Every structure is written in structure tokens, then in C-alpha cells.
A protein has these predicted regions:
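Gly/Gly-Pro- and Ser/Thr-rich, intrinsically disordered tail segments characteristic of DNA damage-repair
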Residues: 1-178
């Protein structure tokens, strides 16, 4: 699998949305920015989903149609429909791509040891528990992943364990595609 996570600044398209050309020649329709970006991304792959603040594309099946990763990345940047710069990150697991994107947007360094060295604040499932995890001295995905399974699930719920299992490739990812 090859995932690309994209994010635009919150004010990228304005509150009104974006105008999309109609195929029947009628006047352009103005659609909400988030919806318009989703439709735009479907030209690259049929596997597109909004996950939190990121538009996530699974492109492994369509890379050959775009002559590889570099060409696809260039095409995404060149055809960016929003007036603002698009931030992007790529990884073999979508959840890790989103975490890398969050670090990139914040201007933080990207750790080499992924997913173990990723900060917990970049994991959506860990956000409700950040204060407690921090008090326990746990700051990275790897430190939480190393906890015994059953006590961790009792304390933090199954969502965090499931997210870590996905990040380590122990469970498949699934998203509601557009």
C-alpha cells in the first residue's frame, strides 16, 4: 500500500467554497471546500477518504497510470485547486502518513524510526488520553505499543490498541471512501 495524506490551511478556499465546472455546460456550481477537494482527489485514485483534517489517498493501484510516485506527486501539486499550498506526506500506512503530515505542518522534525518514535499527539486515538499518558511518562507511539495489551485496553479502551495494531501492520486499515 502507498498512502498520500494532504492538508490545506483552514482558510485555503474561503468559507464559501470552490466553483466546480459542470459537465453539461451550465454555470459552475459552488460546493463546500472539503467536498470539492474530495472530488478533485478522485481523479488520482478511487480510494479517497477524509480522516480528521487530512485528505487521504491510497494510490498503490493507480501509480502506474501516473508513471510512478514522483510524477503523481508533481501532478497533485500542479493541479492543486485551492489557492493555498498543499502539505503532503507519504507512507506505507495511512495512519502514519497522517502523523507525518501533522509533524510537517507544525514544522517539527520527522523521526526516522517510524512508527515507534512518532509523538503521541499525532495519533488521533491517543488524543483523549494524552494527559494521563504523559503523566505515565509515555510520549511516543512505541512506548504505548510496548504496554501489555489487556491492561492497556482496560485503561484506555480498544480504540487506542486498534490504532497501534494498524500502525504496526497487525490489522488492516479501513476508511469510509468518498
Amino acid at each position: 500500500m502507498h498512502w498520500i495524506a494532504l492538508q490545506w490551511p483552514p482558510d485555503a478556499g474561503g468559507a464559501a467554497g470552490m466553483a466546480l465546472p459542470a459537465s453539461d455546460g451550465s454555470p459552475d456550481a459552488v460546493v463546500p471546500m472539503r467536498e470539492a477537494l474530495g472530488w478533485w482527489a478522485l481523479q488520482f485514485t478511487p480510494h479517497v477518504a477524509w480522516v480528521d483534517e487530512a485528505l487521504l489517498l491510497e494510490v498503490s493501484g493507480s501509480l502506474r497510470l501516473w508513471d510512478g510516485r514522483a510524477a503523481l506527486q508533481r501532478r497533485i501539486i500542479e493541479s492543486n485547486p485551492a489557492p493555498a499550498h498543499v502539505h503532503q506526506a507519504q507512507e506505507a500506512i495511512g495512519m502514519i502518513a497522517i502523523a507525518m503530515l501533522r509533524l510537517r505542518v507544525q514544522g517539527q522534525p520527522l523521526p526516522a524510526d517510524r512508527p515507534a518514535a512518532l509523538p503521541l499527539a499525532t495519533l488521533t486515538a491517543a488524543r483523549p488520553h494524552l494527559a494521563l499518558l504523559s503523566r505515565l511518562g509515555l510520549r511516543t507511539w512505541g512506548e504505548v505499543h510496548a504496554l501489555p495489551r489487556a491492561p492497556m485496553v482496560r485503561r484506555f479502551g480498544p480504540e487506542l490498541r486498534r490504532a497501534l495494531d494498524i500502525a504496526w501492520g497487525l490489522m488492516p486499515e479501513s476508511y469510509p471512501w468518498l
